[in-house]
UniProtKB/Swiss-Prot annotation:
One of its GO terms (molecular function) is structural constituent of ribosome. Residues 1-21 are annotated as: Disordered. This is Large ribosomal subunit protein bL27. One of its GO terms (biological process) is translation. Belongs to the bacterial ribosomal protein bL27 family.
């Protein structure tokens, strides 16, 4: 009688879903008010002029304009600003 022993079962095969974090609009690019600039965990980047921050630390534009990244202070904090579009 031909028999085949049961194969072992793998204990692998699990992973968390990616959160799609990071910079969504880069320096010099145009953005509309309410547009998401950066999705992040914690304040890796800080809001500057015309930029708001959500409860999940998402940075978003408060006005229409162009995105500008800079550093500030001795700690070299990464700041995100929106330069308003010329009207």
């Amino acid at each position: 009688m031909a028999h085949k022993k049961a194969g072992g079962s793998s204990r692998n095969g699990r992973d968390s879903e990616s959160k799609r974090l990071g910079v969504k609009v880069y320096g010099g690019q145009a953005i509309n008010a309410g547009g998401i600039i950066v999705r992040q965990r914690g304040t890796r980047m800080h809001p500057g002029e015309n930029v708001g921050i959500g409860k999940d630390h998402t940075l978003f534009a408060l006005t229409d304009g162009h995105v500008n990244f800079s550093t500030k202070g001795a700690a070299k904090k990464h700041m995100v600003n929106v330069v308003p579009a010329a009207v």
